[in-house]
Amino acid sequence: MAAKSDGRLKMKKSSDVAFTPLQNSDHSGSVQGLAPGLPSGSGAEDEEAAGGGCCPDGGGCSRCCCCCAGSGGSAGSGGSGGVAGPGGGGAGSAALCLRLGREQRRYSLWDCLWILAAVAVYFADVGTDVWLAVDYYLRGQRWWFGLTLFFVVLGSLSVQVFSFRWFVHDFSTEDSATAAAASSCPQPGADCKTVVGGGSAAGEGEARPSTPQRQASNASKSNIAAANSGSNSSGATRASGKHRSASCSFCIWLLQSLIHILQLGQIWRYFHTIYLGIRSRQSGENDRWRFYWKMVYEYADVSMLHLLATFLESAPQLVLQLCIIVQTHSLQALQGFTAAASLVSLAWALASYQKALRDSRDDKKPISYMAVIIQFCWHFFTIAARVITFALFASVFQLYFGIFIVLHWCIMTFWIVHCETEFCITKWEEIVFDMVVGIIYIFSWFNVKEGRTRCRLFIYYFVILLENTALSALWYLYKAPQIADAFAIPALCVVFSSFLTGVVFMLMYYAFFHPNGPRFGQSPSCACEDPAAAFTLPPDVATSTLRSISNNRSVVSDRDQKFAERDGCVPVFQVRPTAPSTPSSRPPRIEESVIKIDLFRNRYPAWERHVLDRSLRKAILAFECSPSPPRLQYKDDALIQERLEYETTL
């Protein structure tokens, strides 16, 4: 996967525009952090997030919603700036009512208890597995001991590798960004130009310290440098104060290495999440949102690690222990505890990951804890029915069970490919990603595409019902003679009743507890059917001529052409100057940082968005002097706004 490092970081005076691109122009385009003075964002309405939620990591994507009066728009084109008048709503990228609510969120006791519960689930799952493996060894059952311990080691090592790799990327990128920010403004009030990243030739008078690039799973990950606008001297002072010494960096590296060697990386991330949440409550208003979003990002990371561990360790462990129970026709207490802990861990990981994804996106409404509990019950009962069916069938047909698993995985992978998920750079990388998701589909539903999921949910669970019925029927017809109907019939009843209960909880979630549903849906004051219907511009902007638009666009085109000739690629930086402010009755604009992303939002499901948004987090958290969190604007939002501004100007 060829990734081009074309990233720049420029810090100028508050009257100029600073922008930071995503370091993969071949795939993801650019990320631009616009300087203060731009209008604040307005709205986006919710839709179903892929993966049960939305991005993990700091990103918010959005649609244009013009429901909040006086909110202002994002960086407009043609010099209009997309400013909303007092009577109309601003066309922007994130719903103002939703976004302001996110900024006012605070770390609560329930958040802390939820994370502690996740730690308890993790210890119960891994602890019972290790305890059972030791019990098998002491009883001389070496084959079962080896299989049980193998799945524990496989899941733990995989999680530690991913966790340490993310630490290396985050730590190295943070050091590079702080060093660049510290050296960018040697004197107060001086113009600063700092370029961070490798790639094309550096411009005149620009320094280019390289930043490591991280690529994980089947996604392209890019390093992001960020700029602080309007506060040159203070920003440089704070950045230089945060620059770590060599001894401090060595101690951090040593500590993290020991933590991950001892297989405690996931536990450390859980407690680090709690620490960041407590810091967000104890910090001032300017630092509160920064620590809060760091906590959200960290929890998204550890939730993804938990999800990875469950499908590498808990799911096969659960099937293995149930097969042993069926073959031996006996149930030990420790085996029952191990199976129950693995089942709870699977359901918890899916529900917790969806909550983390929705919490990390500012265009999505967060899921309430009651909704998460309903989702947990949904996955708990459907996965329970699935693994019990697998255990019954595998106890009689070991070879055919393996063939069935491979065949089901192939069908699910082909179906996912047919859904046309779009994330990876090449078609073959996309297919590899779909193959990984196909493993999850063996046990449970996992949304991989944004939009309505009703039809796909119906197809998936209808296929699962047919498979469970066929496997259970074959087991009942060919079961061992010593298995009486007194055991077989209750087992079949448990399978189908558990599946039916899970489907009922799923319907309850979508009917009553989904953030877009009737109970927690948008209020009438924030619901916008048609963004264009509510889009209005101030009189002085609406009466501007097409000539001014053409002039401004010609300036941008010349600048983009210069970058294109220098870099030898299509320009990815499209920074549009805002309209000059004139004395009028226009309400004052709220100073805000806007990160523009040259991507279409709806093409990036939540599972894949986690990888992309881990790159965005550095741009978001680098606005150390910003009084409020920066807003993200995606490519489709800009297109809608440009069309509306063009039609209004005409």
UniProtKB/Swiss-Prot annotation:
This is XK-related protein 4. GO terms for cellular component: plasma membrane. The record marks 567-568 as: Cleavage. The keyword Cytoplasm does not apply. InterPro entries: XK-rel, XK-related_scramblase. The keyword Iron does not apply. It is found in: Cell membrane. Residues 216-238 have a biased composition (Low complexity). It comes from Homo sapiens (Human). Residues 1-15 have a biased composition (Basic and acidic residues). It holds the Pfam family XK-related. Its main location: membrane. The modification Phosphoserine is found at residue 200. Residues 1-44, 200-238 are annotated as: Disordered. GO terms for biological process: apoptotic process involved in development; engulfment of apoptotic cell; phosphatidylserine exposure on apoptotic cell surface. Belongs to the XK family. Phospholipid scramblase activity is activated upon caspase cleavage to generate the XK-related protein 4, processed form. Does not act prior the onset of apoptosis. Residues 21-31 have a biased composition (Polar residues). It is a multi-pass membrane protein.
